[in-house]
């Protein structure tokens, strides 16, 4: 049995949710209603995120990237955690509902690109269009956009020990099929609502400590 780690990006690897930061800085006021409808699950993640980015003019591309480079912070302990999983031959994937134009630059030098799965953006028109290269498979009908549970099924074997690390509603479907969940923020609420066992965390030092214990117990 091997351990597979599937980790969210926004609000998990980074301290802040970069999509929400973009919306607060660059989107018109109507973005707030769309965000609330996503969190209440009135809108699917795919529908809601598409609507949010359709509110952002493409001519802000360079300004948005510069803003994120200046404001995004990598969560404490992440660098050491990546070193730990690499040293222990643990498979690590970033499965992010974030966008290629900021996920790749912020993880450059930390995670190989082939281990990162995120959404794609098109800046060729007046407003940003989101493309969805990792849709739901036949076992998921939640219109996730980037379907984390489908990616877990694609990238791993059913006999693997699946660990999901996340913070929000976008991680819920993945958490439902994980053997171990590390949760913070809104994902804690959703895990409790859905009776999903989880371990809370604030830094990746917390995750690493628990993973060391798992290595001793599970392997």
Curated annotation (Swiss-Prot):
EC number(s) reported in the record: 3.1.3.87
MF-aspect GO terms: 2-hydroxy-3-keto-5-methylthiopentenyl-1-phosphate phosphatase activity
Pfam family of the protein (one): HAD
Pathway connected to this protein: Amino-acid biosynthesis; L-methionine biosynthesis via salvage pathway; L-methionine from S-methyl-5-thio-alpha-D-ribose 1-phosphate: step 4/6
Entry-linked SUPFAM superfamilies: HAD-like
Catalytic activity: 2-hydroxy-5-methylsulfanyl-3-oxopent-1-enyl phosphate + H2O = 1,2-dihydroxy-5-(methylsulfanyl)pent-1-en-3-one + phosphate
Gene3D superfamilies referenced in this protein's UniProt entry, alphabetically: 3.90.1470.20, HAD superfamily/HAD-like (3.40.50.1000)
UniProtKB keywords: Amino-acid biosynthesis, Hydrolase, Methionine biosynthesis
Organism superkingdom: Bacteria
Family: Belongs to the HAD-like hydrolase superfamily. MtnX family.
PANTHER family: PHOSPHORIC MONOESTER HYDROLASE, UPF0655 PROTEIN YCR015C
Protein name: 2-hydroxy-3-keto-5-methylthiopentenyl-1-phosphate phosphatase
Source organism of this protein record: Bacillus cereus (strain ZK / E33L)
Gene that this sequence comes from: mtnX
């Amino acid at each position: 049995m091997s351990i597979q780690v599937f980790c969210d990006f926004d609000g998990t690897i980074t301290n802040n949710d970069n999509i929400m930061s973009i919306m607060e800085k660059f989107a018109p006021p109507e973005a707030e209603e769309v965000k609330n409808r996503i969190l209440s699950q009135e809108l699917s993640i795919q529908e809601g995120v598409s609507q949010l980015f359709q509110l952002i003019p493409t001519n802000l591309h360079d300004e948005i990237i510069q803003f994120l480079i200046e404001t995004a912070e990598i969560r404490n302990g992440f660098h050491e955690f990546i070193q730990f999983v690499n040293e222990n031959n643990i498979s690590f994937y970033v499965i992010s509902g974030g966008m290629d134009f900021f996920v790749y630059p912020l993880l450059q030098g930390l995670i190989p690109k082939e281990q990162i799965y995120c959404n794609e953006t098109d800046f060729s028109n007046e407003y940003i269009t989101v493309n969805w290269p990792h849709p739901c498979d036949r076992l998921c009908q939640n219109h996730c956009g980037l379907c984390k549970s489908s990616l877990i099924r694609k990238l791993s074997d059913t006999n693997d020990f699946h660990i999901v690390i996340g913070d929000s509603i976008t991680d819920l479907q993945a958490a439902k099929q994980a053997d171990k969940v590390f949760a913070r923020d809104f994902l804690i609420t959703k895990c409790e609502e859905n009776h999903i066992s989880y371990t809370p965390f604030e830094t990746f030092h917390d995750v690493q400590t628990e993973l060391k214990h798992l290595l001793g117990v599970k392997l």
